[in-house]
Amino acid sequence: EGIGTTFVIRVPFKIDLDVDIREEQADVSEKSIKGLHILLAEDNELNMEIAEFVLQNEGAEVSKAWNGEETVELFRKSESGEFDAILMDIMMPVMNGYEATKMIRSLDREDAKVIPIIAMTANAFTEDRLRAKEAGMNEHIAKPFDVKLLVKIIHKLVH
């Protein structure tokens, strides 16, 4: 005894009974791509598998294209409004993502002018972003991509 100090602190507080309600509201207000149909253009098998898994895990339906030409053809053959967004790799064989985007934008159908097209590329320099915009892409995301950022971008562009 006689060594040290003892403190007694009393802090009155109320127990938050609405915490569950707020957590549910936060979940609802969180960005979602559930139910969206996304055209995924990617020539690398592993990258395709990862992106497809991520998108499906977030509740999206995915159609796959392995090069720019295939992407243009899938979009051309689709019903107007069938796809909600296109995730476009840039460096692909047969036709790159820039050329594919220009071709899609030039198609004579209303949704071709407005469908969100998002560049997915390892090149994240300002000039790459500018080139994507010039080709008609709405947004640019660097690989490897952050899932929450990708979902946020798709949600923002679609809604």
Each PLM stretch: what is its role?
Residues 1-159:
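C-terminal compact regulatory domains
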